Amino acid sequence: MKRILLLSITLISAVYYIEAQSIRTIKKELQQSIEKHETELIKTSDAIWEAAETALLEFKSSKILIDQAKRNGFDVEEGVAGIKTAFTASYGSGRPIIGILGEFDANAGISQKRKPVKEARIPGGAGHGCGHNLFGTASLGAAIAIKEQIEKGNIKGTVIFYGTPAEETIFAKVW
């Protein structure tokens, strides 16, 4: 009986160690994926910053994210819920389903140059005071990293990036 108990504890410990190693490896690979896409993600964020489109008018911004998702192998559905700038980008199949929101709308009247002092890029124009250029881009970057892990067979399931317009003023998170 003691041998069986000792063997069971040893096996459980080995499985736990293998699982912990697997999780560490996946975390490392996720980070490497983000680093691999860093230049592309920075360009995306910068382009959305420059577009600075307000609620339901984020046509350039949504296209930038849609194009990047397609280049990275996602299936994209545009015009979700009848909202022209809403979209989903999905990869994989089955469960779990990992959903990631990505906002990209700007605020009216807060245009800003990339400077630490107040200086409008376009006087009276829209700007990204809440950092949605970063949020939308970073969220898509996370979805890409997860997609690559699904593709490698390291994790199972589906990842869905929800391109979320009009977060600042209307209702986009409810669709």
Model-identified regions with their sequence ranges:
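Acidic/His- and Gly-rich active-site-bordering loop/insert found
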Residues: 21-128, 137-159, 168
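Surface-exposed loop and adjacent secondary-structure segments within mature catalytic domains
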Residues: 169-175
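Bacterial Sec-dependent N-terminal signal peptides
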Residues: 1-23
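Short loop/turn motifs enriched for small/polar and acidic residues
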Residues: 164-166
